[in-house]
Curated annotation (Swiss-Prot):
It comes from Mentha piperita. The keyword Zinc does not apply. InterPro entries: Isoprenoid_synthase_dom_sf, Terpene_cyclase-like_1_C, Terpene_cyclase_plant_C1, Terpene_synth_N, Terpene_synth_N_sf, Terpene_synthase-like, Terpene_synthase_metal-bd, Terpenoid_cyclase/PrenylTrfase. It comes from the Eukaryota. The protein CAH10289 described in PubMed:16083926 is inactive. Manganese improves the fidelity of the reaction and the products consist of 98% (E)-beta-farnesene and 2% (Z)-beta-farnesene. This is Beta-farnesene synthase. Mg(2+) 1 binds at residues 301, 305. Pathway: Secondary metabolite biosynthesis; terpenoid biosynthesis. It catalyses: (2E,6E)-farnesyl diphosphate = (E)-beta-farnesene + diphosphate. GO terms for cellular component: cytoplasm. It is found in: Cytoplasm. Its EC number is 4.2.3.47. The lineage of its organism: Eukaryota, Viridiplantae, Streptophyta, Embryophyta, Tracheophyta.
């Protein structure tokens, strides 16, 4: 017994094997950017003029099909935020319209748009395309545009809607085997992207940047919408680069890449998450705040997971729980830096929240950081002491280590619709929050190169699942892919259900976008976009480097 106690005592002083993270590939790429106010003003004036014409076009659309295709195009081009009132008005008309005469393309488009706009619509609308054997009619297999529309619609389904799972299988099979050479370029490119990233799960502004390039080559394009989308993206890209410049300079003042060499230097990648949450111009605080929230999460994760001993981790958790600057003196030097970094961000946050009428958010932000520390500490003990908890215990802890609560808290001052009641709702751990949290964890654990090696052993949810259910690694990975699919269905259902809880669309979209970013950030073959800069590179280049060509 005494020997066992000595072993445990020694173990608590052992540092985990340190992962050497790749350096930032961006260094000072964005820190010296200077916004041209005159150029922005010119863009703004052009946007306003073109918006008036586009608004007239939208309001002049009379048939449901005209309305739906135009709304879909505006959303794909990243322009819908300019026309929210008009689009919601048209969505109500579409919802009220009879759909008996709609073909597969129109039926599926209507279904998807209504659900994405939080309207209750039954999947029974697809019954007319089912044969006597309960399968989709094979005659549909030659209709590529209809198949694509059904494929996209099927990804807004719920768990209980078996017809939509059948739709995914049916459409994917036929789209993957389709001869697309004779199809219009726009259809070919849409199919290619959808099979990689279904539209409902795609990174909205990254998709918009891609779609502008595709739309430009389409013979049926509308020149007005093309020009508006280009000027709009140019305006937003300049805004993003200005925000990223400010953020980079702030980050450099901390010099954490030298002071905390075990931690990932990822300010640009953190800002990508901010753009993913809300890309629209009015959400500048959200993007900047989210980036700082991500950096807190990343540094805490690396401190617990990549450097701290168990004793140091326990001490840090206790000190953070007291939330007192004077307590920093109890910490090792490197932890003092981490602690002061967190408190500095919080103090600025507290001031911002007060200015923006969101003082009630500050205690919640503090609470989520403490909660995150406790969850990271628990996870590190499992890893270092080689304790495999039950899969359910791991999942419960993972809801916290997903960082979703700290991330959401970090942006509250920039969300007009958030109230104390919103925070109370989130603290009740609603399904929308827990499901989006688990999307990130499931992708984390199924991403092959993301599985963290500890002294030659791997410890992730896959390990817990393999042990508890006697599965091979491949079987566990397949099970997790299934969990991702089922969890998305829960998100889809709760996204609509929030309209019954007095939770605004702005908040529901925020959680939905978290899941979308997770989907875009993890790869089964290349790892994750925060740990490996090469995975995030394409998105960074598309959003902040490559200029729109007019």
């Amino acid at each position: 017994m005494a020997t066992n106690g000595v072993v445990i005592s020694c173990l608590r002083e052992v540092r985990p094997p340190m992962t050497k993270h790749a350096p930032s590939m961006w260094t000072d790429t964005f820190s010296n950017f200077s916004l041209d106010d005159k150029e922005q003003q010119k863009c703004s004036e052009t946007i306003e003029a073109l918006k008036q014409e586009a608004r007239g076009m939208l309001m002049a659309a009379t048939t449901p099909l005209q309305q739906m295709t135009l709304i879909d195009t505006l959303e794909r081009l990243g322009l819908s935020f300019h026309f929210e009132t008009e689009i919601e008005y048209k969505i109500e008309l579409i919802n009220a319209a009879e759909d008996d005469g709609f073909d597969l393309f129109a039926t599926a488009l209507r279904f998807r748009l209504l659900r994405q706009h939080q309207r209750h619509v039954s999947c029974d609308v697809f019954d007319k395309f089912i044969d006597k054997d309960g399968k989709f009619e094979e005659s549909l297999s030659n209709n590529v545009e209809g198949l694509l529309s059904l494929y996209e619609a099927a990804h807004v389904g719920f768990r209980e809607e078996r017809i939509l799972q059948e739709a995914v299988n049916f459409t994917r099979h036929h789209l993957e085997g389709a001869e697309l050479d004779q199809s219009p370029l726009l259809i070919r490119e849409k199919v290619k992207r959808a099979l990689e990233h279904p539209l409902h799960r795609d990174f909205p502004i990254v998709y918009a940047r891609l779609f502008i390039s595709i739309y430009e080559k389409d013979d049926s394009r509308d020149e007005l919408l093309l020009k508006l989308s280009k000027v709009n993206f140019k305006f937003m890209q300049n805004l993003y680069k200005e925000e990223l410049s400010q953020l980079s300079r702030w980050w450099n003042t901390w010099n954490l890449k030298s002071k905390l060499p075990y931690a990932r230097d990822r300010v640009v990648e953190a800002y990508v998450w901010g753009v993913g949450y809300h890309y629209e111009p009015q959400y500048s605080y959200v993007r900047m705040g989210l980036a700082k929230g991500v950096l807190i999460c990343g540094i805490m994760d690396d401190t617990y997971d990549n450097y701290a001993t168990l004793n140091e981790a326990q001490l840090f958790t206790q000190v953070l729980d007291k939330w007192d600057r004077d307590e920093a003196e109890r910490l090792p030097e490197y932890m003092k830096i981490v602690y002061r970094f967190i408190l500095s961000i919080y103090e600025n946050y507290e001031r911002d929240a007060a200015k923006l009428g969101k003082s009630f958010a500050a205690p919640y932000f503090k609470e989520t950081v403490k909660q995150l520390a406790r969850a990271f500490n628990e996870e590190q003990k499992w890893v270092m002491e080689r304790q495999l908890p039950s899969f359910q215990d791991y999942v419960k802890n993972s809801e916290k280590t997903s960082c979703i609560y700290t991330m959401f808290a970090s942006i509250i001052p920039g969300l007009k619709s958030v109230t104390q009641e919103t925070i109370d709702w989130i603290k009740s751990e609603p399904t929308l929050a827990t499901s989006t949290a688990m999307i990130g964890r499931y992708w984390n654990d199924t991403s092959s190169q993301l599985r963290e090696s500890k002294g030659g052993e791997m410890l992730t949810a896959l390990d817990f699942h393999m042990k508890e259910y006697g599965l091979t690694k491949e079987e566990a990975a397949s099970k997790f892919e299934g969990l991702v699919e089922e969890t998305w269905k829960d998100i889809n259902k709760e996204f609509i259900a929030t309209t019954n809880y007095n939770v605004g669309r702005e908040i529901a979209i925020t959680f939905l976008n978290y899941a979308r970013i997770c989907e875009a950030s993890y790869s089964k073959t290349d790892g994750d976009a925060y740990s490996d800069p090469n995975v995030a590179k394409a998105n960074v280049v598309a959003l902040f480097v490559d200029a729109i060509v007019f």
